[in-house]
Swiss-Prot record:
PROSITE patterns for the chain: ATPASE_C
Name of the protein described by the UniProt record: ATP synthase subunit c
Organism: Shewanella amazonensis (strain ATCC BAA-1098 / SB2B)
Stored Gene3D superfamilies: F1F0 ATP synthase subunit C
Subcellular location, record wording: Cell inner membrane
Amino acid sequence: METILGFTAIAVALLIGMGALGTAIGFGLLGGKFLEGAARQPEMAPMLQVKMFIVAGLLDAVTMIGVGIALYMLFTNPLGAML
């Protein structure tokens, strides 16, 4: 029983940690490409900014879904009932 709970805690930590790492890398790439595009064509900066914020919101949504799944795994462990 303790090993299942331990492995669940490790899985939750990896899920949240890797989600945060992926989001950080994604935001870095997104911001860099936005600045590159705005520097090349300054007249397109407002349109690019709107698209950047939409993609940033989607990037955050994916991470929040991962956090929700991790918390579900943490508090309602379905494998614990099988023992």
